[in-house]
């Protein structure tokens, strides 16, 4: 039988791989973001709100962290605002200063309406292939290869991932990250942003040419809409993998075959030298675990607010998404 512990505060600093705002070049520091905030795939968050979840642990529906031994620890609430990649302030409840949802915003609306994304979306996705599903999903799985390192190694951070996202908004994603400070790649699993908290798994290394598999799937029996999910990120080449087990906190009806996200990119040669990445074997399943044979992928490119204009393009088939940069 599990035992519930007392509330705990975040006592361990977020992983050192995650860049602090204080360490960003001046031109990449959004105005108003505190110096101690951490850069994540979802924007900038207070260190106390960026939390690690270990192997065999699980985030429960009420935000409790269930440890591998069954002990449950009630996590401290995140009371600090966070910021999108371009500095839009977001309350822990996901609302902006105008009282409107921020991260759901125009991207979700565009998928639903099958229309272009308006300018100035408040997230860091530069390119994404996705669609809005009227049926609750049960799984998305995709494969991709780690691209060559950039020829211009600076302090850029670049993320690639498939994902499932809700209107809550919560996003579950297996992530490949490149970090210019170390000129290296890593893999991890993420869940954001219920009540302003970002959860991340252990990190495992990757290198150019490695084959990667990302798998986000419900753990309930097929045929029921499920709130219990695993996010598995595997380096098929090395045989290593990480898992984040979590509650979904909403219906994950925004499906993404692949996305590109970037921070502190000053020139096009700071992207991987291949110029593109292809997500292959992309398969979407509904809550009955019936495969969606022809997902209606929408190709969304939001580079309108970027000073740097590279070769941003998207190509999709029923089972692939190629992102050009």
What label would you give each PLM region?
Residues 8-325:
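Exposed, interaction-prone regions of secreted/extracellular proteins
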Residues 2-6:
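C-terminal segment of classical bacterial N-terminal signal peptides
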């Amino acid at each position: 039988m599990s035992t519930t512990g007392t509330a705990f505060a975040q006592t361990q600093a977020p992983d050192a791989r995650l860049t602090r705002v204080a360490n960003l070049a001046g031109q990449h520091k959004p105005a108003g973001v505190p110096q101690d905030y951490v850069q994540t795939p979802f924007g900038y968050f207070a260190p106390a709100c960026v939390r690690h979840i270990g192997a065999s642990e699980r985030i429960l529906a009420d935000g409790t962290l269930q440890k591998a031994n069954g002990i449950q620890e009630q996590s401290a609430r995140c009371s600090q605002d966070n910021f999108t990649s371009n500095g839009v302030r977001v309350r822990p409840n996901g609302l902006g200063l105008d009282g409107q949802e921020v991260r759901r915003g125009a991207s979700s609306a565009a998928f639903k309406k099958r229309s272009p994304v308006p300018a100035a979306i408040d997230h860091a996705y530069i390119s994404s292939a996705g669609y809005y599903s009227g049926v609750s999903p049960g799984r998305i799985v995709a494969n991709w290869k780690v691209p060559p390192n950039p020829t211009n190694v600076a302090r850029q951070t670049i993320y690639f991932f498939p994902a499932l996202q809700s209107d809550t908004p919560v996003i579950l994603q297996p992530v490949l990250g490149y970090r210019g400070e170390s000129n290296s790649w890593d893999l991890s699993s993420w869940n954001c942003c219920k009540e302003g908290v970002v959860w991340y798994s252990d990190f495992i290394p990757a290198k150019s040419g490695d084959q990667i598999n990302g798998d986000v799937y419900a753990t309930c029996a097929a045929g029921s809409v499920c709130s219990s999910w695993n996010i598995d990120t595997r380096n098929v080449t090395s045989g290593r993998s990480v898992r984040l087990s979590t509650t979904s906190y909403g219906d994950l009806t925004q499906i993404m075959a692949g996305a590109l996200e970037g921070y502190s990119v000053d020139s096009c040669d700071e992207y991987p030298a291949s110029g593109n990445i292809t997500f292959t074997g992309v398969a979407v399943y509904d809550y009955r675990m019936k495969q969606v044979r022809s997902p209606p992928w929408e190709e969304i490119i939001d580079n309108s607010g970027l000073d740097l204009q590279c070769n941003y393009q998207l190509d999709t088939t029923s089972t692939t998404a190629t992102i050009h940069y």
